[in-house]
């Protein structure tokens, strides 16, 4: 009988929940700012966890500086995880900046720019969108 979710998926979901709570309540570092854990990928042997994070940067904070500050807390977060989650081996945590949101916004802006350029060119030539379909 197959399981609905594999063990690695269940462990990654649990790690995501626990890390989110720990970052919110236990890590007191103003350099990190507001952090969101978007995904966790756990290796098949559960030895490594790649944690994808995004930041809401305020003032002079950058994602790079926030990520560097967060990486300083990797050993202590791993130790706290070991106390909260009972696994034979607590995964080594590796934080990675998740730029999918930024890339998605960039792609959306590119599409919007192209659509606006097409509309402007059509207006300059005196054609309408319904004329395009008739040709």
Curated annotation (Swiss-Prot):
Compartments it resides in: Cytoplasm
Family to which the UniProt record says this protein belongs: Belongs to the RbfA family.
HAMAP family: RbfA
A GO MF label: ribosomal small subunit binding
Keywords annotated in UniProt: Cytoplasm, Ribosome biogenesis
The protein's assembly and partners: Monomer. Binds 30S ribosomal subunits, but not 50S ribosomal subunits or 70S ribosomes.
InterPro entries: KH_dom-like_a/b, RbfA, RbfA_dom_sf, Ribosome-bd_factorA_CS
NCBIfam families: rbfA (TIGR00082)
A cellular component annotation (GO) from this entry: cytosol
Species of provenance: Aliivibrio fischeri (strain MJ11)
Any single biological process term in GO: maturation of SSU-rRNA
Pfam families, sorted: RBFA (PF02033)
Protein name, entry field: Ribosome-binding factor A
Task performed by this protein: One of several proteins that assist in the late maturation steps of the functional core of the 30S ribosomal subunit. Associates with free 30S ribosomal subunits (but not with 30S subunits that are part of 70S ribosomes or polysomes). Required for efficient processing of 16S rRNA. May interact with the 5'-terminal helix region of 16S rRNA.
């Amino acid at each position: 009988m197959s399981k609905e979710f594999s063990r690695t998926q269940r462990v990654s979901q649990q790690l995501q929940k626990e890390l989110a709570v720990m970052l919110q309540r236990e890590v007191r570092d103003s350099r990190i700012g507001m952090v969101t854990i978007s995904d966790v990928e756990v290796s098949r042997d559960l030895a490594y966890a790649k944690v994808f994070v995004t930041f809401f940067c305020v003032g002079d904070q950058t994602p790079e500086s926030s990520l560097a500050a967060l990486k300083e807390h990797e050993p202590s977060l791993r130790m706290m995880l070991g106390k909260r989650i009972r696994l034979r081996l607590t995964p080594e945590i590796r934080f990675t900046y998740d730029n999918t949101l930024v890339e998605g916004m960039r792609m959306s802006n590119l599409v919007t720019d192209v659509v606006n350029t097409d509309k402007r060119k059509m207006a300059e030539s005196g054609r309408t969108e319904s004329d395009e379909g008739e040709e």
